[in-house]
Amino acid sequence: MGFRFPVKTKLPPGFINARVLKDSFKRQQAADHEVTVTALKYIARNTALPTRARMEAQLQLAVMPNYTRMTQVRNRCIATGHARSVITDFRLCRTQFREKAKNGELPGVKKGVW
């Protein structure tokens, strides 16, 4: 059985399923290509540069694989792998956040009383 992704990646901590692996791979690739993508976007949007250079930068951006884009990355819960209703500061979905907060496992979080 061959490797599923074009480049080897390290396994993420916490819960692992196929979606978490795919998201982790996309995160790593987006981080690796971040400088290149930023430079190409700057060149493509700079009106002071010649049109040919700008067009070549746009073509290079278009040819890059989808997994190198930050828009492909999805926030996921590190405990369950859920993608919806994730609280970004804790990287937990709402149900896991509620359970861990009730059990006192999240430092600085307590039940609201007013």
From Swiss-Prot:
It holds the Pfam family Ribosomal_S14. GO terms for biological process: translation. The keyword S-adenosyl-L-methionine does not apply. One of its GO terms (molecular function) is structural constituent of ribosome. Keywords: Mitochondrion, Ribonucleoprotein, Ribosomal protein. It is found in: Mitochondrion. PROSITE patterns: RIBOSOMAL_S14 (PS00527). Disulfide bonds: none annotated. Gene3D superfamilies: 1.10.287.1480. Belongs to the universal ribosomal protein uS14 family. This is Small ribosomal subunit protein uS14m. It comes from Eremothecium gossypii (strain ATCC 10895 / CBS 109.51 / FGSC 9923 / NRRL Y-1056). The lineage of its organism: Eukaryota, Fungi, Dikarya, Ascomycota, Saccharomycotina. The gene is MRP2.
